[in-house]
């Protein structure tokens, strides 16, 4: 009963149709039930209503009823919105080039990439190389600049070397005015003269250190003891080899003897043992 009474609420039915009451279902006398106030939303009818119930016409609606039509006007089919194209989605494999509705799919290219490509083509003039192709050229230019920056060794003539050596023998260090005067006389730059004197001073210092080392070695060898022949009581001689360079260079003379003057080392070599 309750479900049937609830189903009767809603928009007023068509003319001549009574509300869903026991009398109307049992076929009682025609009587009109009080109408429900206008404006209440219609409830959906239950599926358990008897087949004897008469449903009002779908197209009829009270002029003052603003309740939504649950069944709606005659089923016109679902409304289809036009498909929204997605340019970022490419055409899947095995499908045609056009999507539903005859819309052509665009290749997989985001709008930002396409805009960037168009902007780059617009900014770069026709025939100009791309930035990627300029990098190897820049590297080659840097290599050439590095090769050009290498200092080349200055080749001096014999007259220039002689004049520089003479000046160096007189003075190891030159003042700025002397260096400028010497450079102008030799047709050289002050930098070249300065570099030559620096190299010459380094060479001179190396020569001094080598000569000093050689002198120290000679002095150490001169201080070594020299062994001479020794005479023992039994008149036996002990010969010790002595270098000839360390023997006395001057001859020895014996007074009152007729022996010719002989150096000591010659006498030493002629002795019999």
From Swiss-Prot:
InterPro entries: HD (IPR001356), HD_metazoa (IPR020479), HMX_Homeobox_TF (IPR051300), Homeobox_CS (IPR017970), Homeodomain-like_sf (IPR009057)
Subcellular location: Nucleus
GO cellular component terms, semicolon-separated: chromatin; nucleus
Gene3D superfamilies xref list: Homeodomain-like (1.10.10.60)
Keywords for this protein: Developmental protein, Differentiation, DNA-binding, Homeobox, Neurogenesis, Nucleus, Transcription, Transcription regulation
UniProt key word Thylakoid: no
DNA-binding region listed in the record: 149-208
A GO molecular-function annotation: DNA-binding transcription factor activity, RNA polymerase II-specific
Family under the similarity heading: Belongs to the HMX homeobox family.
Family matches, as PANTHER family: HOMEOBOX PROTEIN HMX, HOMEOBOX PROTEIN HMX2
Name of the protein in question: Homeobox protein HMX2
Organism of origin: Homo sapiens
